[in-house]
Swiss-Prot record:
Catalyzed reactions: di-trans,octa-cis-undecaprenyl diphospho-N-acetyl-alpha-D-muramoyl-L-alanyl-D-glutamyl-meso-2,6-diaminopimeloyl-D-alanyl-D-alanine + UDP-N-acetyl-alpha-D-glucosamine = di-trans,octa-cis-undecaprenyl diphospho-[N-acetyl-alpha-D-glucosaminyl-(1->4)]-N-acetyl-alpha-D-muramoyl-L-alanyl-D-glutamyl-meso-2,6-diaminopimeloyl-D-alanyl-D-alanine + UDP + H(+)
Lineage: Bacteria, Pseudomonadati, Pseudomonadota, Gammaproteobacteria, Pseudomonadales
Function text: Cell wall formation. Catalyzes the transfer of a GlcNAc subunit on undecaprenyl-pyrophosphoryl-MurNAc-pentapeptide (lipid intermediate I) to form undecaprenyl-pyrophosphoryl-MurNAc-(pentapeptide)GlcNAc (lipid intermediate II).
Family matches, as InterPro entries: GlcNAc_MurG, Glyco_trans_28_C, GlycoTrans_28_N
Name of the protein this chain belongs to: UDP-N-acetylglucosamine--N-acetylmuramyl-(pentapeptide) pyrophosphoryl-undecaprenol N-acetylglucosamine transferase
Gene name of the encoded protein: murG
Pathway assignment: Cell wall biogenesis; peptidoglycan biosynthesis
Record's keyword annotation contains GTP-binding: no
Species: Azotobacter vinelandii (strain DJ / ATCC BAA-1303)
Location within or outside the cell: Cell inner membrane
Length: 356
């Protein structure tokens, strides 16, 4: 294996999955990929499973924390910076790629202190705290959505790295006489407001007009969600988690889901229209900004959680069921927003910086 590359990403799948796509691309080009994370994030499951060496530093989030945590913050930051710097000196990476999460703050500073080229990638339409802080230090800034960062010669709009199997070329035509196929996604933990809203909304639609329903409700909530559908007299397949996203994306005609950056990018890749219900308490309301990107282009409808009732959702579902051509147009517009070359582009930028 060739020279070392260090990827920094942690905390949630929204950071880790795009980073894994980049890791595979680096490996395909002959580079040895190392990973910088924390002891608590999802990277502790996913990165070793991918066969990648995981290096950990002690760092956590500060926003919204209590006074005691804030008082300890300077010491934690200094400790994590020394830990990250030691790892940089051991690995001597030709490039460091920051994909978000708490780990990227001290990791990015350590990269600059040790002279390693630094590239950052922001998955959301609103930049996270670490990436905002690192932007002046970074050699290149990659953004998934246009104009997330201020215009600069370092900025490139790349899209989000998405697994290649999710890019679906087939058209989204709904055959006459077939019921609408509705996919509901709540993420691995589930979105309990959606788990409550969907059964209530579907119960308001006449039985003969109801869509076929596949609902991913989260590991903790799938049984209670299935009970709600049964009590409402609505037929639905409810699962805790979906392993094969490509299969369910190919099956679906319409998706109801949150608006995390990775989800929005996957919808575009799969060419799927969506009803997006952004998480209302997301930091900087970034999910609303993510959703607005698809909604402005006519690829999705944005439904605020605070004002969307079961009756509102039932009416929207009934409308699109009766006008499948509307969904077909939304699907085509979603597909036009896809960035199939995002992974390759991000890695190209990293190696361009590495070569100086």
């Amino acid at each position: 294996m060739g020279a070392n590359v260090l990827i920094m990403a942690g905390g949630t799948g929204g950071h880790v999955f795009p980073a894994l796509a980049c890791a595979r691309e680096f490996q395909a080009r002959g580079y040895a990929v190392h990973w910088l994370g924390t002891p608590r994030g999802i990277e502790n499951d996913l990165v070793p499973s991918a066969g990648l060496p995981l290096h950990r530093i002690q760092i956590g989030g500060l926003r919204g924390k209590g006074l005691a945590t804030l008082l300890k913050a300077p010491f934690q930051l200094i400790r994590s910076l020394f830990q990250a710097r030691r790892i940089m000196n051991e690995l001597r990476p030709v490039c460091v790629l920051g994909m978000g999460g708490f780990v990227t703050g001290p990791g990015g500073v350590a990269a600059k202190l040790t002279g390693a080229p630094l590239v950052i990638h922001e998955q959301n339409a609103v930049a996270g705290t670490s990436n905002r802080a690192l932007a002046p230090l970074a050699d290149r800034i990659c953004e998934a959505f246009p104009d997330t960062f201020k215009p600069t010669g370092k900025r490139r709009t790349t899209g989000n790295p998405v697994r290649s199997e999710l890019f679906l070329d087939s058209s989204r035509q709904i055959p006459d006489g077939r019921r609408l196929r509705l996919l509901v996604l709540g993420g691995s933990l589930g979105a309990e407001p959606l788990n409550k809203l969907l059964p209530a909304a579907l119960a308001l639609i006449p039985v003969e007009q109801r869509p076929e329903l596949f609902h991913q409700a989260g590991r903790q909530h799938h049984e209670s969600t299935a009970d709600r559908y049964r009590e409402a007299g609505v037929e639905a397949e409810v699962v805790p988690f979906i392993e094969d996203m490509a299969r369910v994306y190919a099956w679906a005609d319409l998706v109801v889901c949150r608006a995390g950056a990775l989800t929005v990018s996957e919808l575009a890749a799969a060419g799927l229209p969506a009803l997006l219900v952004p998480l209302p308490h997301a930091i900087d309301d970034h999910q609303t900004r993510n959703a607005d990107y698809l909604a402005r282009e006519g690829a999705a409808f944005l439904l605020p959680q605070a004002t969307t009732t079961a009756a509102d959702l039932a009416a929207r579902l009934s409308e699109v069921s009766m006008h499948p051509e509307q969904l077909e147009g939304m699907a085509a517009r979603a597909r036009r927003l896809a960035k199939p070359d995002a992974t390759r582009t991000v890695v190209d930028i990293c190696l361009e910086v590495a070569r100086g």
